[in-house]
């Protein structure tokens, strides 16, 4: 990339800053949840909604981000994304109640939903095709550093300042990024087809109200009748989308995608698999602090081995899949993650704290292998004319399933615990034990889906790529 113009390199730095802000925010909040609950006078059982409100908003807004960038221009949308994310961060820090915090997190989510996909689109437009991979590696590197710094930085800020600072640190970075975007980034636009507003609204309503219904009386305090009503509205909205998308060439996501068997299996497995995996980043720091009495900073440090294991495994995951095939790898890693979850619970409750970093490192390795395998399985056989749509749908499903996973984790804590779980409670560790056992079962269930993946040991990633490049 040294032969790129200085202006292009600066534009890549702007995109990289956006990736860093978004990735840091996904992990820095988790460590601060118990302190937020204490400050806002809320039960820790309700704090999962701080994560859900952000991730669910990202899932809802993702399908519109690419169209908006093409229609309005990448500079305008990227600038808007940074401004909304920064304003959301400010409002989060100023929140005095949980409801105010949830609304501010949703505003952050609108910005976060546009920041990463529009950043990728920007790189595609400003960098020559032969240098695209190198450029994407450069801009996504800060996105890998964010999850590594997030838990420890969040714990440090909470322990030695207050939870408000996990949001306030975004403000100077956001201001610099917004100014640099206006000054340095070109405003590329493209001719766009008509946006499928009807399909977008149906999907948005379906995802949002079903997640709220799942949260139920434990999180939202709704009556059983209201929960049933929300569930009915959500199901009807999704059914109406299926009817809307049938034989509709302008649908947000074409149903032709599901004619590819590996896409259907991969998407179903990704949805179910990330529900289980989505529980872990939320539950682990909460368990360490409330269940075991760790300080916020200590709990944040304990999360670093998991991120290191995930980053380290990415270097060899392709060779692993090439050697053993998708079915074996996905079934083994799904069951393995369930067993590692049980191992983490057991070692923690037995007080073997010196073993926990090794267990979390192993958890990161297994989870990373499964994530990478699920992603490539889902997309590898799609025809070129459906690849972009399939990738967008997968991105949306990833965010939706993670929000559902966090919701279910909060629901399990509510089912097994009382309204106020605290470190001093004699039943707290029992509550967490039953919750972890239930999570391990949920994590293992997608193995039944992955067992239906064709036995492709000899039709692996490298071969599949060569076939597609030859077409």
From Swiss-Prot:
It is a multi-pass membrane protein. Residues 1-11, 70-76, 125-137, 186-196, 246-262, 307-341, 417-430 are periplasmic. Its main location: membrane. Residues 33-48, 98-101, 159-164, 218-224, 284-285, 363-395, 452-471 are cytoplasmic. GO terms for cellular component: plasma membrane. It is found in: Cell inner membrane. It holds the Pfam family MFS_1. It comes from the Bacteria. The keyword Cell inner membrane applies. Gene3D superfamilies: MFS general substrate transporter like domains, Multidrug resistance protein D. One of its GO terms (molecular function) is transmembrane transporter activity. InterPro entries: EmrB-like (IPR004638), MFS (IPR011701), MFS_dom (IPR020846), MFS_trans_sf (IPR036259), Multi-R_MdtD (IPR023721). Keywords: Cell inner membrane, Cell membrane, Membrane, Transmembrane, Transmembrane helix, Transport. The chain crosses the membrane at residues 12-32, 49-69, 77-97, 102-124, 138-158, 165-185, 197-217, 225-245, 263-283, 286-306, 342-362, 396-416, 431-451. Belongs to the major facilitator superfamily. TCR/Tet family. NCBIfam families: efflux_EmrB, PRK10504.1. This is Putative multidrug resistance protein MdtD. It comes from Escherichia fergusonii (strain ATCC 35469 / DSM 13698 / CCUG 18766 / IAM 14443 / JCM 21226 / LMG 7866 / NBRC 102419 / NCTC 12128 / CDC 0568-73).
